[in-house]
UniProtKB/Swiss-Prot annotation:
The chain crosses the membrane at residues 8-28, 32-52, 66-86, 94-114, 158-178, 383-403, 406-426, 451-471, 475-495, 540-560. Keywords: Cell membrane, Membrane, Repeat, Transmembrane, Transmembrane helix, Transport. It is a multi-pass membrane protein. Its main location: membrane. It comes from Shigella boydii serotype 4 (strain Sb227). GO terms for molecular function: monoatomic cation transmembrane transporter activity. This is Putative transport protein YbjL. The gene is ybjL. One of its GO terms (cellular component) is plasma membrane. Belongs to the AAE transporter (TC 2.A.81) family. YbjL subfamily. It is found in: Cell membrane. GO terms for biological process: potassium ion transport.
Length: 561
């Protein structure tokens, strides 16, 4: 039996789609030196090659892919978007605006200079910025622009072509820039990170190991009684002196949870909770009494929970003001926008921040109720909320405004992005609403993006040879300019206008470009995860601005003549 693979793929859109995805994901795992191609470029290359052979898929799959992707981007940005936008993120907002705005203006100028159409220009902007949201926003706006069908088809093909030709240029140039730009300025990045560490009490060790607290019990001997000198636990400040917390006391056979007024007595048996190194550093007066292995005394459920910051008495406060150790809890991690932050007593908490807290289950529950709620570790997605907000986003995208003969609509991309932001924001404020496990959200987002990339590649593949021959050199030059010049402008603005610390500035610049690989290089150069503070500050707002940039470039293009 002979199987004609070409006919089989042409006759089955679903089979073709998943063949492209499988081959592209395999290709994306390849490395060129220290640079991995990545899933997006792998799928794009395979789809372009098959597109040259005139394979194609239904455009409905393409549309659904970009809708899922942009909605999930909004959900991820939602918890921190408004806090960054309205409160302490003025510098980060301005940096993101400068980065995206300068790239948009430069792309428009180069597009007109080289005589390209809007498709090539918008695609070049998206590829040079390595930003799929730009591609998605521009494509959606083009489809609703009222172009006649042949002109629209050409613009969409050129959009994909421009993106494909400049994506690797944008990615590689930014990674190289992230490696060498810090060396061209006067201030050493590592020194800048250490300066912030000294000013704010930051832990500069990016690879800090996290240990869970352990329980050990000791019998109070004469040395410890003498050490306490009759002071109660509150006056002694046991945690400040030892790094351990007295969780239980057995006195005369009676087990109790001590309060601050308790005074240690000879023969008491105490259960100490603390990190292993804190136990090792205990004063000999604690250890000289016989260590106790009492099942009831040591029977404590130590848990580690992710606590989401929500309540007004915690939002806007510094970490030190939470006084977690006074409540017998230990802070392991601070996570903002999926980025682990340095544990800094002076970090101001935003709504939606996640604190990983360890301690006795009752105490962790108490502290969680005080500052927010414990993140639900369920594997069940709230599909009702997901679908409802998806519908709301599509309805928002249908809204149009008429000004004389000119009509303006938000489009599906902006509508779904806004609806996703609202869902993410509400999830951060209401623990039982709209829960989507991070793994599920990442999977849907990645799948939507890959479907979209497969669609644009198959659509543009037939014209890529002609495009390379006619405009390849122009695209190379334009891609380098749009990728690097906004970064330099952003650096000058942040360094000499905003006068930002260099470690925070470079992190914020990579966040404004939403480029995680470049962020890793900055952190390595600084020997610190302090740049993550800046990265998290601009990342959420940049995702939104980049989507809007794709819409804006299509809208303003006709008016430029």
């Amino acid at each position: 039996m002979n199987i004609n693979v070409a006919e089989l793929l042409n006759g089955n859109y679903i089979l073709l789609l998943f063949v492209v995805l499988a081959l592209g994901l395999c290709l994306g795992k390849l490395r060129l030196g220290s640079i991995q191609l990545g899933n997006s470029i792998g799928v794009l290359v395979v789809s372009l090659l098959l597109g040259q052979q005139h394979f194609s898929i239904n455009t409905d799959a393409l549309n659904l892919g970009f809708m899922l992707f942009i909605f999930c981007v909004g959900v991820e940005a939602g918890p921190n978007f408004f806090s960054i936008f309205f409160r302490d993120g003025k510098n980060y907002l301005m940096l993101a605006l400068v980065m995206v705005g300068s790239a948009l203006v430069i792309a428009l100028g180069l597009g007109k200079l080289f005589g390209w159409d809007i498709g090539l220009t918008a695609g070049m902007l998206a590829g040079s910025m390595t930003s799929t949201p730009v591609l998605v926003g521009a494509g959606d706006t083009l489809r609703h622009s009222g172009m006649e069908s042949r002109q629209l088809s050409l613009a969409l093909d050129n959009l994909s072509l421009g993106y494909a030709l400049t994506y690797l240029i944008g990615l590689v140039s930014l990674i190289v820039g992230a490696r060498y730009l810090p060396k061209l300025q006067h201030q050493d990045l590592q020194t800048s990170a250490q300066q912030i560490a000294r000013e704010r009490g930051l832990d500069t060790d990016a690879n800090r190991k996290v240990y869970l607290p352990v329980i050990r019990a000791y019998r109070v001997g004469p040395e410890l009684v003498a050490w306490t000198d009759g002071k109660n636990l509150r006056e002694l400040g046991i945690y400040r002196q030892t790094g351990c917390y007295i969780e239980r006391i057995r006195r005369n056979g009676i087990l109790a949870n001590p309060d601050g007024d308790a005074v240690l007595q000879m023969g008491d048996e105490i259960a100490l909770v603390g990190y292993p190194d804190a136990h090792a550093r205990l004063d000999p007066s604690f250890r000289n009494g016989k260590e106790v292995f009492d099942r009831d005394l040591l029977d404590m459920r130590i848990v580690t929970e992710e606590v989401v910051v929500k309540n007004h008495n915690a939002v806007g406060k510094r970490l030190a003001q939470l006084k977690l150790t006074d409540h017998g809890c230990f802070l392991n991690r601070v996570i903002r926008s999926q980025i682990e932050m340095p544990i800094d007593d002076n970090v101001v908490l935003n709504k939606g921040d996640v604190l990983q807290v360890s301690g006795d289950a009752r105490r962790v529950k108490t502290i969680a109720d005080r500052i927010g709620f414990i993140s639900i570790h369920s594997q069940v997605t709230d599909l009702l909320a997901f679908c409802a907000f998806f519908v709301i986003g599509l309805m928002i995208g249908m809204i149009t405004f008429q000004f004389s003969t000119f009509s303006f609509g938000m489009g599906n991309a902006a509508g779904l992005l806004f609806a996703g932001i609202m869902l993410g924001f509400m999830r951060a404020n209401h623990p039982t609403f709209g829960y989507i496990p991070q793994g599920a959200l990442s999977m849907v987002k990645e799948f939507g993006l890959m479907v979209f990339m497969a669609g644009v590649g198959l659509s543009a593949g037939s014209g890529i040879n002609n495009g390379l021959g006619a405009i390849g050199g122009q695209m190379l030059i334009a891609g380098l300019i749009v990728s690097l010049v906004p970064v330099v402008i952003c650096f000058l603005f942040g360094a000499y206008v905003l006068r930002m610390n260099r470690a925070l500035l470079f992190g914020a610049m990579m966040g404004a470009r939403t480029c995680a690989p470049a962020m890793e290089i900055i952190s390595d150069t600084a020997h610190s995860n302090i740049p993550a503070l800046g990265y998290a500050g601009t990342y959420a707002i940049a995702n939104v601005l980049l989507t809007l940039a794709g819409t804006i470039i299509v809208m303003v293009w006709p008016g430029l003549g």
